[in-house]
Swiss-Prot record:
CDD domains per record: RabL3
GO molecular function: GTP binding; GTPase activity; protein homodimerization activity
Signal peptide: none
Organism in which the protein naturally occurs: Gallus gallus (Chicken)
UniProt GO BP: B cell differentiation; intracellular protein transport; natural killer cell differentiation; regulation of protein lipidation; regulation of Ras protein signal transduction; T cell differentiation in thymus
Binding positions (GTP): 16-21, 148-150, 179-180
Designated name of the protein: Rab-like protein 3
GO cellular component: endomembrane system
Protein family (similarity comment): Belongs to the small GTPase superfamily. Rab family.
Keyword GTP-binding in annotation: yes
Keywords linked to the UniProt accession: GTP-binding, Nucleotide-binding
Length: 230
């Protein structure tokens, strides 16, 4: 069998949000029995069929890089972590739906990975300084995933999901909310599975079919500009 082409997707978010459990579920379609803290970075692989069911279908390796640590780490730690950000093709931003702080920190995680967390003055950009325009021209595909959906009380679910919808909109990304202990949330044919497949297709298209991806990106940007004008 010929070697498969591959893409690199970072999985970023605060410690304890369930990144390792999510990656295990994505790669093995199984619940991770005994999750532990990730030190440094852990890499797992998912096999993905690009444009499945079409004449263009082709199989790729999706490398999922689960990066550990805290977004508020010292500069020396962040510099070490920056090694993992080289040659990235996509980013999955993971937050705990029961922890609002983990959602807010996604702004800082994304800016750090995209080398935009430091202003020309050297001052750290906080999520309070976040400007949606910073991502308007971002060409790295993003996906926002909220975990621990099962732990949100029914009385608060609408409030939480409304807030996370705005979060995904800020990143110009689709969102998936799930419980990592229940594989049915990513069952084949489900809306979540479709979103996930669409995200991986975007990552592959950006990496291996850039001209096609660029035309779609520019069309999408033009559409957003027209919506803002009206």
């Amino acid at each position: 069998m010929a070697a498969l082409d591959r893409v690199k997707v970072l999985v970023l978010g605060d410690s304890g949000v369930g990144k390792s459990s999510l990656v295990h579920l994505l790669c093995h379609n199984q619940v991770l029995g005994n999750p532990s803290w990730t030190v440094g970075c852990s890499v797992d692989v998912r096999i993905h069929d690009y444009k499945e069911g079409t004449p263009e279908e082709k199989t790729y390796y999706i490398e999922l890089w689960d990066v550990g640590g805290s977004v508020g780490s010292a500069t020396s730690v962040k510099s070490t972590r920056a090694v993992f950000y080289n040659s990235l093709n996509g980013i999955i931003l993971v937050h705990d739906l029961t922890n609002k702080k983990s959602s807010q920190n996604l702004y800082r995680w994304s800016l750090e990975a995209l080398n935009r967390d430091v202003a020309p003055t050297g001052v750290l950009v906080t999520n309070g300084d976040y400007d949606r325009e910073q991502f308007a021209d971002n060409q790295i595909p993003l996906l926002v995933i909220g975990t621990k959906l099962d732990q949100i009380p029914e009385t608060k679910r609408n409030e939480v999901l409304t807030r996370t919808a705005f979060l995904a909109e800020d990143f110009n990304a689709e969102e998936i909310n799930l419980d990592c202990t229940n594989p049915r949330y990513l069952a084949a044919g489900s809306s979540n599975a479709v979103k996930l497949s669409r995200f991986f297709d975007k990552v592959i298209e950006k990496r291996y079919f850039f001209k096609r991806w660029q035309s779609r990106f520019l069309a999408s940007r033009k559409e957003r500009d027209l919506e803002e004008e009206h």
